[in-house]
Amino acid sequence: MNGKRILLIDDDPDYVYAVKMILEKANYSVRVSYSPKEGYAALQDGEFDLVIVDVMMGRGAEGIIVARKLKKDRELKKLPLLMITGIREQTGFFFIGDPRHETFLPVDGFLEKPVNTEVLLNKVRELLHSDQTAELKQEKQGEEP
Amino acid sequence: MSDRYTILIIDDEEVVRDSCSQILAKGNFRIHTAADGDSGLKMTEEFRPDLVFVDLKMPGLSGLQVLERINRFDPTIVTIVITGYATIDSAVDAMKRGAYDFLPKPFSADEFRLITRRAVEKRKLLLDAITLRHEKEVIRENFTSIVSHELKSPLLAVQQNLYVILDGMVGELNPTQKEMMERVKNRVDSLLRLINTWTDMTSIDVSELKKRFKPVDIPALVSKAVEVFQAQAAAKNVTLVTDCARSVEPVNGDEGTLLEVFMNIMGNAIKFSERDSSISIKIEGGDGELHVSVSDKGVGIQKEDIPFIFDDFYRGKVQASGAEMGSGLGLAISKRIINAHDGSITVESEPGKGSTFTVVLPRETGKSRTHGKEKVAEQFAIWRSD
């Protein structure tokens, strides 16, 4: 174990099976929630270093609601959030460039399904790393005054 | 839908208001009357009548002005002009301002009933058209999202699991197993691409696209597309040569979809190019227009294929050697996008020698449409209020 904990929120068990496998082979500890509701519960009773969320769940683009909710939460917004989606047209016309938008789609990373193994692991490493540097910066800032 | 229609009668003569109300009293209508244009307009805004009878000659706002404002407020409201000085000119004037019919004074009760019945029919048709259009739109949207989600989800799950297997994360594959898995992965890939292209195509709403128009730097867009394909071209040792006129003014359009068009054309050019050849891309400004042409020295297009290459799902007889079969949608989508820009996309080709695709875009889209502005407004009027 490299000690990093990832929460995966996606309602497709077969898709989750593969992504969980990739992450676990890379020594991450993975917890899966099959709905936004389960995801919120998991965030309440567990500690995580990264959240990966799918866009299309349940009756529509519920993943976007999850992203907005997390980024509004004082504590949870510090968690890096990676969005994975198979639905291009829901997030931006033709999906050219980076669809992130600080209010519409407040996520830290965005990948399109199916995700290449290396691409996924690189993105996860990058987000976990930027989280650490952000923490370091905050600590430093805290020390200065 | 309730079949009780609301009718408003705007006339300064009390006799006319009363007799009209009386004639229709037995019918299943809600009847309101107004003595002048101002109060008539106020009532129109308040309860959106189905039919409005307007007297042409009234003190204050004239009947024609009232007509015009009702039409602007809600073009689906059916208006009928009542007038004492019936001339062809005044009738034509009223029609131009959106009146549906014309009732010369004095009129008989039967005449009035008949014209009311006709107007109610018209109103019903207009409302039905709106409902139908709306339903069609909902079906189209739902269908697209069902296709996206229900068709893609299983394929995405399959593909993600294949990646895990192919990357040897659940044990090494022997060469035969690996080969078979690669084949499976490629087939799933092209199926996913087909679904993506198809949903892209159905999600292009031309009127939505126009709302996003802004000045686009075409040479910059073209070089973006060139950049995307650089690696693919290099793999076949194909050189991409861009030749751009010095000062090219921006074109009014939608950057995202125009990029899609240029990428489509360039992707095709590379796909059908011979190894070690070159593709020339020319950008020229013309008379209020911009031309972008992409010429390859590839296999070319058979003469009998040319009339159909912009049709949905059409694939030419000659396919690129070694390349994957296309979906037959790329050019169809490109044509749709270019049409939305009031431009044109054409091809010239000689089998065995190569093809040239030319996109012509007007500097300012919309100019050509202003001629038929009234006609367009008429067509829009039917569904503008929904």
Question: What do these predicted regions represent?
Answer:
Chain A
Residues 61-65, 88-111, 118, 122:
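Alpha4 helix (beta4-alpha4-beta5 surface) of REC/receiver domains from two-component response regulators
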Residues 47-53, 57:
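Active-site beta3 strand of CheY-like receiver
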Residues 122-140:
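The C-terminal output helix
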Residues 12-18, 117:
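Short acidic/polar segment at the start of the alpha1 helix of CheY-like receiver
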Residues 27-35, 42:
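Short hydrophobic/Thr-rich beta-strand motif most characteristic of the beta2 strand and flanking loop
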Residues 47-49, 74-80:
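His-Asp phosphorelay/catalytic-motif detector in bacterial-type signaling
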Residues 17-25:
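Charged docking surfaces used in two-component/phosphorelay signaling
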